[in-house]
């Protein structure tokens, strides 16, 4: 692996983005090259170590996919250390140099997390990150830029926080730098890779929010000939300030992260985007970004996908704010309570985007074989069919998004009948056992 750096000095991050400088060494093809952003740029992981991302080039096309990895979120001490539960902020030790090539991290486990020694990038989390996956997708022949998440803020934060709720004697200083890191990656691509004939911004889970937040940043800096968005299982649901949690179940979460991650503070992502695109969004409602993007970029195709039975993103969204969920005695009862809120939010989310012809969506009911129906594009594309519409898997939606030859596909499964009753029942049972032990 070739170590690579992108910037020689720090510039004002509230003004123009840093310009890239020539790299040390020579880029390879069809191999993962590490890019490390220097500390002087303001980039870092949550623990203060350097932010690193990875590039897999091809000489045969300028088309490029940027992958924003999933990996949870955090706004308390144990979650940011990725301790006590799997459902916290991932990569609490930072990003290892061997992140994409070895399952075991080369970093010391300084956070004490039982999960951090595993390199998620080497797990094959998505077919989009593999040129040889049996789940085929057009972008496997493109240039691939893979962005790990290590800041616990779904790529949107700009705040140094101190958390001491779990251990007041040993407070944790945590760097929510996701917004800064992401903009620096965009600038690196613009300075070090050819202008893409087509740029796909793709993210799953936490990364799905990341690509939504930073779509405009990457478009402005990289200036691709054509650009598309694929956001999988990380929705920004309607949550206007001043609303009620009964009507908008994600409101307590949004209120919390605004403060914890500095979203509304000077230099935060909300005032920054509103200053750049005046009048296009509503500062009181993070979900206004969902409709701002198709307004700003009417010629770009934007696709959103999730599962109606996703208990994982629902748990992240609601568990810390609704005591009745955590106090329910069984995981089945907890999931039922989660999904009541989750499914209530899907309708208004889709309704807000329906007026825009460049927006499409693919919403199956369940995919029990993957993380309690979390994500349509993780690991494989299997079990993502919508039989009532004759759609065999999510790849039909992805091809429609990328080809651009027809109106955007809009597919929503109305049936809740299991596609494979016996298999789904067994998988759900195993998932319940697993997730109870992981803290769900």
What are these regions, as identified by a protein language model?
Residues 2-14:
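Bacterial N-terminal signal peptides that target proteins for export
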Residues 18-19:
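Hydrophobic helical h-region of N-terminal Sec-dependent signal peptides
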Residues 27-440:
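C-terminal His-loop and adjacent cap/lid subdomain of alpha/beta-hydrolase
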């Amino acid at each position: 692996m070739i170590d690579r750096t992108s910037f020689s000095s720090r510039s004002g991050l509230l003004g123009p983005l840093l310009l890239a400088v020539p790299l040390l060494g020579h880029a390879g093809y069809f191999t993962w090259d590490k890019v490390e952003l220097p500390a002087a740029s303001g980039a870092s992981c949550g623990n203060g170590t350097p932010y690193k991302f990875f590039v897999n080039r091809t000489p045969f096309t300028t088309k490029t996919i940027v992958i924003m990895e999933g990996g949870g979120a955090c706004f308390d001490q144990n979650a940011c250390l990725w301790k006590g539960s799997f459902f916290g902020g991932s990569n609490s030790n930072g990003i290892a140099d061997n992140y994409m090539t070895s399952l075991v991290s080369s970093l010391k486990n300084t956070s004490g997390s039982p999960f951090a020694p595993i390199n998620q990038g080497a797990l094959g989390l998505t077919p989009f990150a593999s040129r040889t996956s049996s789940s085929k997708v057009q972008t496997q022949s493109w240039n691939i830029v893979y962005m790990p998440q290590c800041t616990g803020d779904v790529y949107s934060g700009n705040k140094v926080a101190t958390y001491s709720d779990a251990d007041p004697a040993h407070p944790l200083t945590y760097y929510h730098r996701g917004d800064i890191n992401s903009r620096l990656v965009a600038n690196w691509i613009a300075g070090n890779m050819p202008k893409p004939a087509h740029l796909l911004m793709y993210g799953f889970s936490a990364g799905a929010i990341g690509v939504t937040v930073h779509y405009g940043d990457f478009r402005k800096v990289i200036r691709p000939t054509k650009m598309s968005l694929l956001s999988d299982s990380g929705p920004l649901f309607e949550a206007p300030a001043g609303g009620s949690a009964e009507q908008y179940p994600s409101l307590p979460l949004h209120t919390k992260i605004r403060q914890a991650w500095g979203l509304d503070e000077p230099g935060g992502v909300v005032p920054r985007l509103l200053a750049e695109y005046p009048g296009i969004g509503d500062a009181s409602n993070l979900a206004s970004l969902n409709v701002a993007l198709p307004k700003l970029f009417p010629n770009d195709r934007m696709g959103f996908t999730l599962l109606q039975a996703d208990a994982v993103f629902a748990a992240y969204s609601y568990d810390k704010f609704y005591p009745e969920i955590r106090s329910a005695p069984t995981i089945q009862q907890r999931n039922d309570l989660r999904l009541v809120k989750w499914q209530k939010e899907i309708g208004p989310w889709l309704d807000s985007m329906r007026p825009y012809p460049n927006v499409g969506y693919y919403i199956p009911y369940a995919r029990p074989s993957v993380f309690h129906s979390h994500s349509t594009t993780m690991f494989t594309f299997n079990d993502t069919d919508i039989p009532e519409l004759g759609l065999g898997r999510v790849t039909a939606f992805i091809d429609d998004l990328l080809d651009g030859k027809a109106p955007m596909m809009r597919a929503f499964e109305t049936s809740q009948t299991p596609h494979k009753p016996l298999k789904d029942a067994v998988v759900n049972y195993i998932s319940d056992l697993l997730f109870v032990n992981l803290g769900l």
